[in-house]
A protein has these predicted regions:
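Structural detector of well-ordered beta-strand residues that form the stable sheet scaffold
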Residues: 5, 56, 135, 160, ...
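Short beta-strand scaffold segments in enzyme catalytic cores
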Residues: 46, 93-97, 224-227
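Gly/Ala-rich phosphate-binding loop of Rossmann-like dinucleotide-binding domains
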Residues: 49, 153, 262
Length: 300
């Protein structure tokens, strides 16, 4: 079975739930408070591990209590933490507000994540073999993302970029990807096309393909996900559930997708698997605490 390497952010999530999100300049009395592991990279690595796969996680944390707790938590999930770098900066922290409908607003202090350099990730990249899967996001410096994509793709790895948070990515990097997985907002940032339905998703996907991407999956919340490859598009429906917290839905989707692909599952079938994992996660509070087990996904 091919290896899965996740390179990305490690945060501590501080979550406050309230009936609605505050407007600018407004204070809202919240309800429950929760603190747990987070960060897009970490969430995706945990999702891979929860699907029953070994995963190597490459990240940067501070020499502080948050960094200590994060590494211990990853080890408890069975994640290989041997390439997590310690930095003389605070560990990343995310402040998350969740409303009564499960929608969220997030502000991230990147801290040590912002100092993960191309040099830091080189020892991990030396382990990559042809057919391995490398999963990246954009909560680390773009120079590090670009270097990873160049080296991993040259080694024959399947490089998957979840371009979150939304940012412009160079055509050079896009052309080396096996797959890109933006949500609607991220797809608009990358293409300038507002994605609201299947037709606009196809236009955005075609624009990305024209920039060199081979395959595009645009996640569209409750509408599902739009897959475009080989000049054809198809909608992968989402499962209807009652959402409690959507914080890590995209991360669970990407992690489960990589797990399925590592098993040799065809892309369309892997996306159906990812949709099930993501659907389960939004019915639970928190990021990493919401991630289902492999058995739960198989039985969904």
């Amino acid at each position: 079975m091919n290896k899965i390497i996740v390179i990305g952010s490690s945060n501590t999530d501080m979550v406050v739930r309230s009936e609605r999100l505050p407007r600018a300049g407004e204070s809202v009395i919240g309800g429950n408070f929760m603190m747990a592991g987070g960060g897009k990279g970490a969430n995706q690595a945990v999702a891979v591990a929860r699907m029953g796969h070994r995963v190597l996680f490459v990240a940067a944390v501070g020499n502080d209590i948050f960094g200590n707790a994060a590494i211990e938590g990853y080890k408890n999930f069975g994640i290989d933490t041997s390439h997590i770098i310690r930095k003389d900066e605070p560990s990343g922290v995310a402040l998350i507000m969740v409303d009564g409908a499960g929608q969220n607003s997030i502000s991230v202090a990147l801290g040590a994540n912002n100092s993960l350099t191309p040099e830091d990730i080189m020892p991990a990249l030396e382990q990559i073999a042809e057919g391995d899967i490398v999963l990246l996001q954009l909560e680390i410096p773009m120079a590090t993302v670009d270097a990873c994509v160049e080296i991993a793709s040259a080694k024959g790895a399947k490089v998957i970029l979840n371009p979150a948070p939304a940012a412009i990515v160079s055509d050079t990097t896009l052309s080396k990807l096996y797959l890109i997985t933006p949500n609607q907002t991220e797809a608009q940032t990358l293409t300038g096309i507002e994605v609201t339905d299947t037709n606009t998703a196809e236009l955005a996907a075609q624009k990305l393909v024209s920039q060199g991407v081979e395959r595009v999956v645009i996640t569209m919340g409750s509408q599902g996900a739009y897959l475009y490859q080989d000049g054809k598009g198809v909608m992968i429906p989402a499962h209807k559930v009652e959402a409690v917290d959507t914080t890590a839905a995209g991360d669970v989707y990407n992690g489960a997708l990589c797990a399925a692909l590592a098993e040799g599952t065809p892309l369309t079938e892997a996306l159906h698997f990812a949709a099930k994992a993501s659907a389960i996660s939004v019915t639970r509070a928190g990021a990493q605490p919401s991630i289902p087990t492999r058995a739960e996904v198989d039985n969904f």
